[in-house]
Amino acid sequence: LRVPEIVEKNMSLTRDPRKVYEAVLASLFPHHPYGTQTVLGTQEDLKNPSITNIKNYKKTWYVPNNIAICLSGDFDPGKMIVTIDKYFGHMKPNMNLPKLNLAKEEALTAPVVKEILGPDAENITLAWRFPGAASKEYETLQIVSQILYNDKAGLIDLNINQQQKALSAYCYPLDMADYSVLLMQGRPKQGQTLDEVKGLLLEEIKKLRAGDFDEKMLEANINNFKLGLMQQLEKNESRAQMFVNSFINGSNWADEVTALERMSKLTKSEIVAFANKYLNE
């Protein structure tokens, strides 16, 4: 495994999106593992990995009382239990499974600005930190993100992309267990500066905070969200993934299945209040 990991790490060092992503997380989470370490680790980590530490890590965490087997499909539950027992029944629980006491991030009082150098065309990324994926705030964030950008008729679509004010612009939410993130990204046209693109993106945030958008946009995006969820639920893979996400994020399954009902009741005033609370400069 060591050689592929080193190759992947070396490749990541030349990929601007990866470097930007890691810089964003390091800026938003200076005290949390989301920002203090990366999935691949450092070059120093990969030079001389400890096999003993790897084995101990597996022994500690890869245990039945820290694992979920998520299934969806047309199967006989009785036969499936036998199959699961056959392949996973040998695993022993860790009765001393550690509890992760991770540092809580303090509120950011000023923008954190980082410049990344690389071979790709220049672009700008803006990011805001939110509560984790199991929170009610993340439910609202998903709708807010759709109002801003949905590749058709969001604020960014209508006011930036369709008017060709920048080469491209978009936003999307990033869901994680302890925190979530809203990312906005834009690419400048020839002769346009990154600060100008930043201004365009922030202008759409200001419109959201001021309530300068049609209330029908909220209703339409909620309906689109419903449609997307219905289409996902037609696939066994998507249904099983919902179980996985709920397990990883530590959410109550009852909250998961009623999330759409709550999201459907969101009002424009609630969206505006949410934007003013979290989407500041």
What are these regions (language model features)?
Residues 2-9, 201, 221-229:
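Short amphipathic alpha-helical coiled-coil/interface segments
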Residues 12-66, 90-135, 146-195, 216-228, ...:
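Non-catalytic beta-strand/loop surface segments
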Residues 73-78, 190-192:
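Helix N-cap motif at beta-to-alpha junctions
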Residues 87-95, 202-213:
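A common structural junction motif
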Residues 137-139:
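Zinc-dependent metallopeptidase catalytic helix centered on the HExxH motif
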